[in-house]
Amino acid sequence: SRTGAVLSPIGKKYYDLFVEMEKRLAELSMEAKRESLQLEKSVHIGVPEGWDVLSLIEKMEVLLSTRGEELKMTFSAYSYRLLLSQLRNHQIDGCICPKGLIVPLEHMAFLDLPPLQNVLLYSRKHCPPENGQEYTVKDFRKEKLLLLEQEDTSIPKAYQLGFLQDKGIIPETKEYHNIDSILLDVSLDKGFAISDIWSRGAFDRNLSCLKLDQKMPICVAWPENHSFDEMRLFADLFKESMEPLQ
């Protein structure tokens, strides 16, 4: 030692024991950290691009905190085509999406959510309504319906056209690669779009909304037997976070 003191045999044993204990404590600490990481509950969720679900995520975080539960949530936005591809290939743990996209897929579990109110988006510069008071769907019968390009699935297009055909409207259509291009052309009064209240377009200052007499079924979906406990927790929390909105 620095003082020149020499440990007695029993002192040496105590010293060696202390060094060994310090080493073992460090090893146990690392082992505990590794185990904690392995046990961490986490989910990676896909959502359709253009959907604004921030307020719901914040409500979920409050629910988790007040209940003392832990669930790490990360989110990515995709086109419908990429969303389904990521889901099938297990690149995401689950998704929030229109139920119509999930029903045709095999080996998928899902939890129904409260349906979303559909809206018709049109430019604030659009000509006044025919009745001089308020718009109806009939006011747009001669306008173009602006749609997302149908790559892997025609379900969203069929859903929108089916609604209009039930109203006796068979519109000319134009397809786009992404939702931002649709919203831009709608704001320029080049047509109208059918969307829902989670769409960014519903809050765009250049657009107006006409509430439709239709609601879209939606769900949280995930591959069967894949991250089941975490996904079920997420699905239940997400549904609960929607309840005050209904």
Predicted regions and their residues:
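Short beta-strand-centered segments that line the small-molecule binding cleft or hinge
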Residues: 16, 58-62, 80-123, 205-210
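Secondary-structure junction motif
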Residues: 55, 135, 141-167
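Flexible hinge/capping segments at coil-to-helix
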Residues: 36-37, 108-145, 229-232
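Short beta-strand-to-loop elements that line the ligand-binding cleft
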Residues: 70-79, 168-181
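A ligand-binding cleft/hinge motif common to bilobed small-molecule-binding domains
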Residues: 96-106, 158, 179-208
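A late-sequence structural motif
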Residues: 208-246
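Alpha-helical "hinge/linker" immediately C-terminal to small N-terminal DNA-binding modules
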Residues: 6-37
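N-terminal winged-helix
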Residues: 30, 34-68, 78-85, 229
